[in-house]
Amino acid sequence: MVDAFVGTWKLVDSKNFDDYMKSLGVGFATRQVGNMTKPTTIIEVNGDTVIIKTQSTFKNTEISFKLGVEFDETTADDRKVKSIVTLDGGKLVHVQKWNGQETSLVREMVDGKLILTLTHGTAVCTRTYEKQA
């Protein structure tokens, strides 16, 4: 089921990313850079391990995990979090927890595009990615 997400994805649209970053406590300068950055996300599967690489002019990150198994993650904004990723109804649901807080990153396929919905408290951001050839 994760196979539907495999590929190289380029950000083409972003809504409310600044509000989401503000909610997380990301500083002004980093938010300015984050808002201008158009990252590429590469999703790979190797056996039962999923690898998600995010590449941009600002920062490159990589996580690898097994579905349903908690792992330690350092986010692009340098938060140290406990993460778990599950498949739920065709959606890849990634939950990060730290310091009593929680954020979710939900990836789903809609009309051949990868839609990433980021939620922290009342802040909801939608980012749309198109598959690269």
Curated annotation (Swiss-Prot):
Function: FABPs are thought to play a role in the intracellular transport of long-chain fatty acids and their acyl-CoA esters. MDGI reversibly inhibits proliferation of mammary carcinoma cells.
Keyword line: Acetylation, Cytoplasm, Lipid-binding, Mitochondrion, Phosphoprotein, Transport
Family under the similarity heading: Belongs to the calycin superfamily. Fatty-acid binding protein (FABP) family.
Residues holding octadecanoate: 127-129
Main location: cytoplasm
GO molecular function list: long-chain fatty acid binding
Expression tissues: Mammary epithelial cells of developing lobuloalveolar structures and heart.
GO CC terms: cytosol; mitochondrial matrix; nucleus
CDD domains: FABP3
Modified-residue entries (N-acetylvaline), positions: 2
Gene Ontology annotations of biological process type: long-chain fatty acid transport
Species this chain originates from: Bos taurus (Bovine)
PANTHER family assigned to the protein according to its UniProt record, in alphabetical order: FATTY ACID BINDING PROTEIN
Modified positions (Phosphoserine) in chain numbering: 23, 83
Descriptive protein name: Fatty acid-binding protein, heart
Amino-acid positions noted as binding (9Z)-octadecenoate in the UniProt annotation, renumbered to this chain: 127-129
Membrane-spanning ranges: none
PTM-bearing positions, type Phosphotyrosine: 20
Disulfide bonds, paired cysteine numbers: none
Recorded name of the encoding gene: FABP3
Compartment annotation: Cytoplasm; Mitochondrion matrix
Coiled-coil features, chain-numbered ranges: none
PTM sites of type Phosphothreonine: 8, 30
Annotated hexadecanoate binding sites: 127-129
InterPro entries on file: Calycin, Fatty_acid-bd, ILBP, Lipocln_cytosolic_FA-bd_dom
Domain comment as written in the entry: Forms a beta-barrel structure that accommodates the hydrophobic ligand in its interior.
